[in-house]
Amino acid sequence: GIYNSNRFVLNALLRRLGCEVLDLGIVPDSREATRQALREAAEGADLIISAGGVSVGEEDHVRPAVEAEGQIDLWRVAIKPGRPLAYGRVGRHGPEGARAAVPGSFAHFIGLPGNPVSAFVTFLLFVRPFVLRLQGIQAVEPQAVTLISGFDWTNPDRRREFLRAVHLPDGRLGLFRQQGSAVLTSAVVGHGLIDNPPGQVIRQGDAVRFLSFAELLN
């Protein structure tokens, strides 16, 4: 079966940031149902977050639905995991039955990838600082530290990678063995993310940039 782990993870992360969450549940897999959900969400929320449906498949309705109800300002980012990320705005229609959106009135929209780790990582990197800025907080960037690698990473991606890592007993960083974007265990058991530049090979003893989950979830 398919389990909607994103729903529970995102709810918990948002509440941790002090947000009031309006959970609209699972939207039926059609463009019109997605548009209706966006219209409903825009009337009651400052920020709309979706998980999945922002890629280019035949059943990925979120992007065209947002474009129909507002606009997409950003689509796709060159990171791994998490490339199919979208940011846009959804117009508010005002009084019930109004056909046109109210000029200048909108809810922000962030579309996250559907894979659990991708959704988790992009939430920490993009949604968290965005929400903090909406709350009036200026210092929103997590503080990274430099630590020493206890592993070899010899097949880097062309994109900027965020590798799930664990602290080793000797003080170095170890790599979580399964880096797949569907393996949410790596976020539960891991201690943070290594921010690795595009194409960068990592050898044991190299200095790496580390973002701890304690910092990212603070």
Segments predicted by a language model, with ranges:
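Secondary-structure boundary/capping motif
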Residues: N6, A33, G57-E58, S118-A119, ...
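Short acidic, glycine/serine/threonine-rich loops at helix termini
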Residues: T34-Q36, D60-V62, R89
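Flexible glycine/proline-rich
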Residues: E67-N218
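Conserved beta-strand edge residues that scaffold enzyme active sites
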Residues: P28-D29, S55-V56, G205
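Short glycine-rich anion-binding loops that position phosphate/pyrophosphate groups of nucleotides
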Residues: G53-E59, G114
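Short Gly/Thr/Asp-enriched flexible loops that form oxyanion-binding sites at enzyme active sites
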Residues: G57-E69
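Catalytic-core segments of thiol-dependent peptidases
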Residues: D46-S55, G70
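Phosphate-binding glycine-rich loops and their immediate beta-loop-alpha structural context
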Residues: G1-S50
